[in-house]
Each structure stands twice: as C-alpha cells, then as structure tokens.
Amino acid sequence: MRSSYLEVNSGQGNYRKHVEHITASVTLTNNDSGKVYMCSSADAAVSITLPTTSTGLDGVHYKFIVWEETPSNDITIALGSAIGSIVSKDATGDEGASTQGTQISNIILDTTAQRGDFVEIMFWGGEYVWTAFSSINAGIHTS
C-alpha cells in the first residue's frame, strides 16, 4: 500500500509552491517564508514590508514576480533600513540595480517592468541578499 505522502493530490506533501497575489500594501512575517508572490499594482502603489534586522530569521526567503504587464504603479519592497545587497541583471546585460558594496533599503519593481520579471530575497546574518532579473532595462531599481 502506498503512503499518502506519495499521492500528489493527498495534500500531505508540498508538491506545489504556495503562491499569493499581492494587489495592496502588506507587511510580511517570517511565517510567510518560502511563498511566491505575484505582484500587481493596478489600483495604487504597493509597498511590501519585510521583517527588519531585529525580527528577521536566518534562511527566511521570498520570491516576488511581476504579474501585471507594465505595472500601473511602482511596487516597493521595503527593508526599513539599508541592509540589502543585490545582484541584478537587466535585458541589456547591465548590472542595473546591483548594489556593488553599498547596501540599500528598498527595491522597486518599476512601472516599466514586464510580466515575469522577478526578485528572490533571503535573510542571513542580519541582512538581506537579493537576486533580481528583468527583461527590460531599468525595470527593477533600488533606493
């Protein structure tokens, strides 16, 4: 007899990613780690606040994917302080938003971003490390 863990539809295993659609500002917690967020800003600018350096846990990670083709408003992923280091490539192969040693506080999915552009973020050692890819020049930038 097969274990229910081997049955894809049993609900016992984690065969699928946990995906949520963000359309309004939200504050994420460590418990949201591992989720994939499809991001749209048709109604207003969206701010996504992550755990701070004092509340973040090592290994907490999130993925944000632009769902709306050329978002209506900016989507800002906020850290609360300059604790983010990012490696980024855009459509022209430029380093784009890469921090190159200068940490940042926010990453912005710009109104020029394309559906499928994404950012992966992980907390480690009191700071965030990020990887971002955009199919258009300057679709993702920092502040």
Sequence positions of predicted segments:
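Extracellular disulfide-bonded cysteine-rich modules/repeats
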Residues: Q114-F123
